UniProtKB/Swiss-Prot annotation:
Cited function: ATPase subunit of a proteasome-like degradation complex; this subunit has chaperone activity. The binding of ATP and its subsequent hydrolysis by HslU are essential for unfolding of protein substrates subsequently hydrolyzed by HslV. HslU recognizes the N-terminal part of its protein substrates and unfolds these before they are guided to HslV for hydrolysis.
MF term (GO), any: ATP binding
Keywords: ATP-binding, Chaperone, Cytoplasm, Nucleotide-binding, Stress response
Annotated NCBIfam families: hslU, PRK05201.1
Protein name per the record: ATP-dependent protease ATPase subunit HslU
Natural source organism: Oleidesulfovibrio alaskensis (strain ATCC BAA-1058 / DSM 17464 / G20) (Desulfovibrio alaskensis)
HAMAP family: HslU
Annotated compartments: Cytoplasm
Upper classification of the organism: Bacteria, Pseudomonadati, Thermodesulfobacteriota, Desulfovibrionia, Desulfovibrionales
Family statement: Belongs to the ClpX chaperone family. HslU subfamily.
Assembly behavior: A double ring-shaped homohexamer of HslV is capped on each side by a ring-shaped HslU homohexamer. The assembly of the HslU/HslV complex is dependent on binding of ATP.
Alphabetized CDD domains for the sequence: RecA-like_HslU
Domain of life: Bacteria
Amino acid sequence: MSVLTPREIVSELDKYIIGQEQAKRMVAVALRNRWRRQQLEPAIRDEVAPKNIIMMGPTGVGKTEIARRLARLSSSPFLKVEATKFTEVGYVGRDVESMIRDLMEISVNLVREEERDSVKTRAEAAAEERLLDLLLPSSPAVNTSFDTPQTPAGGAENTRNKLRTLWREGRLDHREVEMEVEMQSGPQMDVMTMPGMEDIGSQFKDMFSKAFPPKRKRRRMKVGDAYAILLQEESERLIDHEKVIELARERAEQTGIIFLDEIDKIASSQQGGKTADISREGVQRDLLPIVEGSAVNTKYGIIHTDHILFIGAGAFHYSKPSDLIPELQGRFPLRVELTALGSKEFLRILTEPKNALTVQYKALLATEGVQIEYTEDALEAVADFAQEANQETENIGARRLYTIMEKILADLSFEAPDKSGERIVIDREYVRQHLADITANRDLTRYIL
């Protein structure tokens, strides 16, 4: 659980997300409240429920990124789902409980990876010893003189140490070894199930996998490939899988975050027909018990959703949060509106974040030996073009920068292998030249940018 203060959380989010201070502060408090809840006595701890949030704002303003970065800060299981994928139970589509099963699967993988890291040193040592066992019999150095009783043992040990040194220096990568590997046995079955019965399908697949256990077969492979397989086997052997499931269940229940995107699409609206409104309301009513707190059966056991944090997000162009059914509105007490981005914000997005687009393209082209530099006026021009395109066509927020940067650097990316060793300056004129044919034609702007 993160012990960062709200101010520190906002500071971390500022490294990746520009603007939206109100939304950052709200999610920072929500995350800190989770830590505060863990400090309470058990009697009152169970009574404190998370305050779910609805983020309102056009696409490309940072709604998803805020939630994703928040989950990474707290090492929490995070699931992003589209609310429009769910349908009422009994209709074709996914049932709402599947999101909890998916969250638990993510939590198990997260904890398993952490456990694998914790046993990494021991697993590497064990895998190295097994690899040396495979290498030593095939080593000609083992066939040394047998004049004295001590020589074979001493010679074998010296050879083993030499092989160990050669392996660590990467000088055995060209060698091949023969070893047993698991081969999938039996039919590969995909069990088709009705909505709401995915867990039964999973149990059937587990049953068939036990009925057809994997067989082992001898194969020749490169030393590096053999070591990777041995490392995985040793890691799995050292991990306590029951402990992994127990920790994953606790983390999913206590720190899980589910991001419900496009939640505005399941709200009733003035423009929707009667049938569409009934269908949307049905999905909302199916969501209600999950958000309120219920027990969901998964292949890892029962998962209680009482303390999972739900963050709903949507543009709300044709509907508003008050169009949701009253019971669901009450389960999302916090509302925050994210503001549309302009050229000033676009310029900051291009320069300030650690993972800025400009940094990404610079690193990509550097792999070809091409060094690119951006002038300040070039980035200002990109920001202005992005704002202009958003105003004249659909407003897709910061995602417009991806399209524009790709267009500007398209020729350079294609010719990069032929320009190795060159230094290229991207200035305002360079930007104008590569966007001139599009910006001059409004119709092209609509379709390309």
